[in-house]
Amino acid sequence: MLNQIVVAGAIVRGCTVLVAQRVRPPELAGRWELPGGKVAAGETERAALARELAEELGLEVADLAVGDRVGDDIALNGTTTLRAYRVHLLGGEPRARDHRALCWVTAAELHDVDWVPADRGWIADLARTLNGSAADVHRRC
């Protein structure tokens, strides 16, 4: 059986990362995640992530630059793997289209977020990414 890849985007702005509050399924509704979705047959992971983020956040694919991986793969089940990538927002303003709400959170706030269980595995990696962003812009988050 083929392994389904699901990609998630860590959209970083300054010292914050964008998180999205789920609407469904009922057992995950109200919890927060990095936005993203499934890679379609014949699609690269980066192209799939740009497409999914554009659809979910009301952006254009040209507004997004998908960068390096963040953290390790997370096995959702025996046939599905979740992967995160850092994403640079080149234009546009994200809007909640498929989610209840969006929120920009700092590294200090990551542990306070009511994450979907799978995304909890990236908290330390996201904190390192955000703290690295702070060093890049010569300010402390």
UniProtKB/Swiss-Prot annotation:
InterPro entries: MutT-like, Nudix_hydrolase, NUDIX_hydrolase-like_dom_sf, NUDIX_hydrolase_CS, NUDIX_hydrolase_dom. Pfam families: NUDIX. The keyword Amino-acid biosynthesis does not apply. Residues 2-131 form the Nudix hydrolase domain. Its EC number is 3.6.1.55. Disruption phenotype: No visible phenotype. It comes from the Bacteria. A motif (Nudix box) lies at residues 37-58. It catalyses: 8-oxo-dGTP + H2O = 8-oxo-dGMP + diphosphate + H(+). Mg(2+) binds at G37, E52, E55, E56. Gene3D superfamilies: Nucleoside Triphosphate Pyrophosphohydrolase. Keywords: DNA damage, DNA repair, DNA replication, Hydrolase, Magnesium, Manganese, Metal-binding, Mutator protein. Its cofactor is Mg(2+); Mn(2+). One of its GO terms (biological process) is DNA repair. GO terms for molecular function: 8-oxo-7,8-dihydrodeoxyguanosine triphosphate pyrophosphatase activity; 8-oxo-7,8-dihydroguanosine triphosphate pyrophosphatase activity; 8-oxo-dGDP phosphatase activity; 8-oxo-GDP phosphatase activity; metal ion binding. Belongs to the Nudix hydrolase family. May be involved in the GO system responsible for removing an oxidatively damaged form of guanine (7,8-dihydro-8-oxoguanine, 8-oxo-dGTP) from DNA and the nucleotide pool. 8-oxo-dGTP is inserted opposite dA and dC residues of template DNA with almost equal efficiency thus leading to A.T to G.C transversions. MutT specifically degrades 8-oxo-dGTP to the monophosphate. In vitro has 8-oxo-dGTPase activity. There are 4 mutT paralogs in M.tuberculosis; the exact function of each is unknown. This is Putative 8-oxo-dGTP diphosphatase 2.
